[in-house]
A protein has these predicted regions:
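C-terminal catalytic "cap/lid" subdomain
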Residues: 1-220
């Protein structure tokens, strides 16, 4: 989480917290799913000899560490928040239920959803889709280091061009790596639009909420 590509960067974390605060003050109800790849990835761990289930469980724990770090950063800038975990681990976080999350967001809390889905073999993307559908979100914002969806990986192909909007059907037909297949199909089936944008540019989150077209909308 930061410039070094691993571990937790307090400066980057502070940037995220301030951006989230800005949007929260607009009256937007916010639920956040955070990954754990800066600490451990279950799939890559299994390729190095770890049991896949154990590896994924380690990855879930990594998301909890990141969630606690983000919670602390949000608290430092005055944003009330709750960490909700897919696996029981009180008092580190509250055990997630849809109703608990919705109630907290209606009370003005930013909810941070951690530990993925609570089950192995599911990615952070799938966990994000699941939580977005469960809490009946209007849109899922996918903050990445790229400013949208391209015809190819722009970090590898300089001729890649960006989409302002694209349908789920076209994403699947082109085999674009917006999210994993399970996550894409879940969003498509439940009519949850995704907006992909570069979260690492300070101020971009508010621009998205203000309606500026700085990323790519994926929709039915």
């Amino acid at each position: 989480m930061g410039k070094q590509g691993y571990g937790i960067d307090p400066e980057r974390l502070g940037d995220y917290a301030r951006q989230i605060k800005e949007v929260s003050e607009m009256g937007v109800q916010i639920g956040i799913v955070i990954g754990g790849g800066n600490i451990f990835r279950g799939l890559s761990g299994s390729q190095k000899g770890f049991d896949r289930v154990k590896g994924d469980q380690m990855g879930m724990c990594a998301t909890v560490i990141n969630s606690l770090a983000l919670s602390s950063a949000l608290g430092a800038v005055g944003v009330k928040n709750k960490v909700l975990t897919a696996i029981r681990m009180e008092p580190i976080g509250e055990f997630y239920t849809k109703w608990k999350a919705i109630e907290a967001m209606e009370q003005g809390y930013v909810c941070i959803f951690s530990a993925g889905t609570g089950s192995p073999y599911f990615t952070t993307d799938t966990g994000s889709s699941l939580r977005g559908i469960e809490i009946e979100a209007d849109v899922m914002l996918k903050g990445t280091r790229v400013d949208g969806v391209y015809t190819a990986d722009p970090e590898k192909d300089p001729t890649a061009t960006k989409f302002d909007a694209i349908t789920y059907k076209e994403v699947l037909a082109r085999g674009l790596k917006v999210m994993d297949l399970t996550a894409i199909c879940m969003c498509q089936d439940n009519n949850l639009p995704i907006y992909v944008f570069n979260m690492d540019v300070v101020g971009n989150l508010k621009k998205v909420m203000d309606g500026e077209e700085i990323g790519t909308l994926v929709h039915n």
